[in-house]
Swiss-Prot record:
Gene that produces this protein: ligA
Keywords tagged on the record: DNA damage, DNA repair, DNA replication, Ligase, Magnesium, Manganese, Metal-binding, NAD, Zinc
Listed SUPFAM superfamilies: BRCT domain (SSF52113), DNA ligase/mRNA capping enzyme, catalytic domain (SSF56091), Nucleic acid-binding proteins (SSF50249), RuvA domain 2-like (SSF47781)
Name of protein: DNA ligase
GO MF entries: DNA binding; DNA ligase (NAD+) activity; metal ion binding
Enzyme class, broadest EC rank: ligase
Listed Gene3D superfamilies: 5' to 3' exonuclease, C-terminal subdomain, BRCT domain, DNA ligase/mRNA capping enzyme, Helix hairpin bin, Nucleic acid-binding proteins
Length: 669
């Protein structure tokens, strides 16, 4: 038993030392923060229980170090400490309660600041007589590397401030997500994440080289000032006055509802995490009063007056065990990696998208490789990077469809199966037809549809309406109640608006916005569209005159409404009594204000989901966009809005509340 403990301590010491080297020196960590912290905590626990095995070279004795021989080493004026950490809300609440108690005992009754924890590289800025004198990396907390000339190339670092004072500041240098992706694509050996890239750039020998890269900085703390400052709130305002870039999401909390306010703000930042233009890996809480900070003091590792609440990692490492090729309803071929189960952003991941052959070649991926998996927000998990190449070469997508064996055709970066009778394409099309956004046939899940195809009960969406559901009665999982619900759901789908049926047909480039454009230009029925498309030249001329319809979309519409298979389906649905015309005098009418307006939504709205509001506006002819661009006409803003508001303001885009649009949209229907 004792020998096992000694072996585990030795193993933990060795691996943590290796991880320290990878993180601080090589800027290429092989594990995430959570894995590292768990190992370090385990080592600390064992050493406290078995102190006879704690040696002077243990990583628990010292800070990690990013010191490099290429730069001059300079001793810090103050210890540059790390932060205490917690990974759960309960731990955060306990710390807040402790700080509230300490505040009351001291009689200072101070507040607490909350700000995003930027996932970048730490920097210490020294100003003398208002002039930037030196910039040091954190190093080992006692000594850092002098990277002054490189830091001077960062545009948001003032080289001189208005007052001739002394300042020692702490900040975080980072690179935006967008710039990280752009730069990483050009590198022979790409970086795992934006933090490592920023660190790698900062440590280039030539400041001229560094100037070519778009590094940025947030300054978040004053370690020393010749000014008299009592709180971090005062310091924050002073930093802004001097022209330093500070995080706009920093908030200060105090009073009776301090804890509730902090927890709500933390959850808001976590929810908005993916909308930030830079990477964050948590939030940092700090006592506001500098006097109380001094009273509370620090350990050798971290200040007692601050804590970091770490978010779940958006990335994880896994091994690719297989690569399969999927066929979509349009025939688009998508390679998917099957990976060993890994927890990423709170979800258990076993599959990850590989996009296309070009992406596979760029990453250099094959079965057996160790990869970084990312999952952000609702985005499908994807393979970001190969970190350990264990297989030779890159996986090659077969030249034939995995389902029907027809030769694949390349269009742009993607491969397509052009066989419209391909069983995989047909199954995916039926799934789309039954989905909530189209005909919304409740009870027909993807697995149920696959089962119906497998048993040869149906072979297209048309046969959903001719199939006798009673044939399912003796099959596993189908009882009388489920069968009756399925019958009712199929029958209910017959009353869906024409625009839902048109969307469900899966015509290329004919999405919700384009359908509404057609409807509100008097192309609001099957008969009007099909009649127009009989004369292809006249149809093309008319469609191109409609705002929002380009040549590609127009040609796809014309082709679809001259396709016998599609026309036969429409005629079948017509005979069955489905709605073949949209009511152009009711909710699909273009309002004089909303006509053709492109909009986006941010925040939450009391009493309304985003989907409901989007549908109400699009019914009136507005066009929904998922992102804020210069082409946007307005941004609809609710409570707890995100960074889209800031971006809209920067672009001069109008922002509206629900009150602003109530005259144009009936919010009560």
């Amino acid at each position: 038993m004792i020998e096992d403990v000694e072996d585990e301590i030795l193993r933990l010491k060795n691996i943590i030392k290796r991880w320290n080297r990878e993180y601080y020196v090589d800027s290429s960590p092989s594990v995430g923060d959570l894995t590292y912290d768990k190992a370090l905590l385990r080592l600390q626990d064992l050493e406290s229980k078995y102190p006879e095995y704690k040696t002077l070279d243990s990583p628990t004795f010292r800070f990690g170090s990013d010191l490099l021989n290429d730069f001059e080493e300079v001793k810090h004026s103050f210890p540059i400490l790390s932060l205490d950490k917690t990974y759960d809300i309960k731990g955060l609440s306990l710390w807040i309660e402790k700080m509230v108690l300490e505040s009351a005992i001291s009689g200072l009754h101070t507040g607490i600041s909350v700000e995003p924890k930027i996932d970048g590289c730490s920097i210490v800025l020294h100003y003398k007589d208002g002039i930037l004198e030196k910039a040091l990396t954190r190093g080992d907390g006692r000594v850092g590397n002098d990277v002054t000339e490189n830091v001077k190339t960062i545009r948001n670092v003032p080289l001189r401030i208005d007052e001739k004072i002394e300042l020692v500041l702490r900040g975080e240098i980072y690179i935006t997500k967008e710039n990280f992706l752009k730069i990483n694509r050009t590198l022979k050996n790409p970086y795992v994440n934006a933090r490592n890239l920023a660190s790698g750039i900062l440590r280039r020998i030539s400041s001229k080289e560094v100037a070519n890269f778009p590094l940025d900085i947030f300054v978040y703390d004053i370690l020393y000032s010749s000014l008299k400052l009592n709180t971090s709130h005062d310091a924050f305002d002073k930093l802004k006055q001097f022209g330093f870039k500070v995080n706009p999401f920093c908030e200060f909390f105090g009073g009776k509802n301090l804890e509730a306010g902090i927890i709500a703000h933390v959850k808001k930042i976590e929810a908005l995490r993916d909308s930030f233009e830079y990477e964050i890996d948590g939030v940092v809480l700090k006592i506001d009063s500098f006097i109380l900070r001094k009273i509370l003091g620090s350990t050798s590792h971290h200040p007692k007056w601050s804590i970091a609440y770490k978010f779940e990692s958006c990335t994880g490492m896994s091994k690719v065990v297989d690569i399969v090729v999927q066929v979509g309803r349009s025939g688009k071929i998508t390679p998917v990696a099957h990976v060993e189960k890994v927890l990423v952003a709170g979800a258990s991941i076993t599959n990850a998208s590989l996009h296309n052959q070009d992406y596979i070649d760029f990453v250099g991926l094959n079965v057996g490789d160790i990869v970084v998996i990312s999952r952000r927000g609702d985005v499908i998990p994807a393979v970001d990077l190969v970190i350990e190449k264990l297989a030779v070469g890159s996986f090659k997508i077969p030249s034939n469809c995995p389902s029907c064996k027809m030769t694949l055709i390349k269009e742009g970066a993607h491969l397509f199966c052009v066989n419209r009778h391909c069983s995989c394409r047909i199954i995916e099309q039926v799934k789309y037809f039954c989905s909530k956004k189209c005909m919304n046939i409740v009870g027909l899940s993807e697995k149920t549809i696959e089962f119906l195809f497998e048993k040869k009960f149906i072979s297209s969406e048309v046969e959903l309406y001719t199939f006798n559901c009673d044939r399912l009665i003796n099959l596993k999982g189908f009882n009388l109640k489920r069968i009756n619900n399925l019958k009712r759901s199929i029958e209910d789908s017959k009353s869906r608006p024409f625009r839902k049926l048109l969307l469900g047909m899966g015509i290329k480039d004919l999405g919700e916005n384009t359908i509404l454009v057609l409807i509100n230009n008097n192309l609001n029925s099957f008969d009007t569209i099909s009649t127009l498309c009989k004369n292809k030249e006249a149809a093309l001329a008319k469609l191109l005159k409609i705002k929002g319809i380009g040549e590609r979309i127009a040609l796809n519409i014309i082709e679809a409404f001259n396709d016998k298979t599609i026309l036969d389906k429409f005629n079948f649905f017509k005979e069955l009594g489905l709605k073949m015309e949209e009511d152009n005098t009711n909710d699909a009418v273009y309002d004089s204000f909303l006509f053709g307006k492109k909009f986006c939504i941010t925040g939450s709205f009391k009493g309304y989901s985003r989907d409901v509001l989007i549908e109400k506006l699009t019914k009136k002819g507005a066009v929904f966009s998922r992102s804020v661009t210069k082409c946007l006409d307005f941004l609809l803003v609710g409570e707890k809005f995100g960074l889209k508001v800031q971006k809209a303001n920067n672009l001069g885009i109008k922002t509206f509340s629900l009150f602003d649009i109530k005259d144009f949209v009936d919010l009560d229907d």
